[in-house]
Design a protein with these regions (language model features):
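Short glycine-enriched, charge-decorated loop/helix-capping segments at active-site entrances
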Residues: 21-28
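N-terminal nucleotide-binding beta1-loop-alpha1 segment
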Residues: 7-12
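Short acidic, Gly/Ser-rich segments with clustered Asp/Glu that frequently serve as metal-coordination loops
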Residues: 15-19
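Active-site-adjacent betaalpha module
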Residues: 1-6, 33-45, 57-63, 69-189
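Conserved H-loop
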Residues: 54
Length: 189
């Protein structure tokens, strides 16, 4: 791929990756080595790297409605700004020149400046990795397509609760016209 490409690494934060967390995604930790390879590839090809993260107020007021219960009755919530749980996992830590987009909903585009950032940088191609398929991966991929970006989801660099959920989402996204390929296929294209 040429310049004008951005790699999104979505929600690779402690509260989604580490075992025992309320919203830990089964299989997410297993994708870390593959995402690291993709990240190294993106960096070596001078792609724009964008780390997309969830970040919520400690009272959960800006969390999506179905998950606000995680902030109630003495529960500590998830991805609370400034906490260890909201931090990007160490293996994928951003470099100083990489962009961090903070979101409060599934899509990285919803109520963020992501589209403006991409247009300012003359990005045409969006490569998506991270967790998890039915929520943030799919929401971001569909919105990127709706904004007329060429979208690639790197299938072995994304995760879901089960392989069946991942496969169902891959089929749906392919049917929408979103390119879904492996890291090896991306590197050989």
């Amino acid at each position: 791929m040429q310049t004008g490409t951005a790699l999104f690494i979505i929600d690779m934060q402690n509260d989604f990756i580490l075992s025992g967390r309320p919203l830990c995604v089964d299989g997410a930790m297993q994708t870390v080595p593959q995402i690291k390879k993709l990240l190294d590839y993106a960096r070596s090809n001078d792609w724009t790297v964008i780390h997309v993260i969830r970040e919520h107020d400690k009272n959960g007021i800006n969390a999506d409605k179905p998950r606000r219960y995680l902030f109630e009755n003495g529960m500590n919530g998830y991805c609370v700004a400034g906490t260890e749980g909201a931090q990007i996992i160490e293996e994928l830590h951003p470099l100083d020149n990489e962009i961090i987009i903070k979101k409060t909903r599934n899509s990285a585009f919803f109520r963020t400046n992501l589209d403006s950032v991409l247009r300012c940088l003359k990005i045409k191609n969006v490569v998506i990795s991270g967790t998890q398929y039915p929520n943030c991966i799919r929401g971001t991929a569909v919105d990127a397509m709706s904004y007329d970006y060429d979208v690639i989801v790197v299938t072995d660099c994304c995760s879901a609760k089960t392989p069946e959920i991942a496969n169902a989402n891959i089929i749906d996204m392919k049917n929408m016209g979103i390119k879904c390929i492996t890291l090896e296929e991306l590197q050989n294209s």
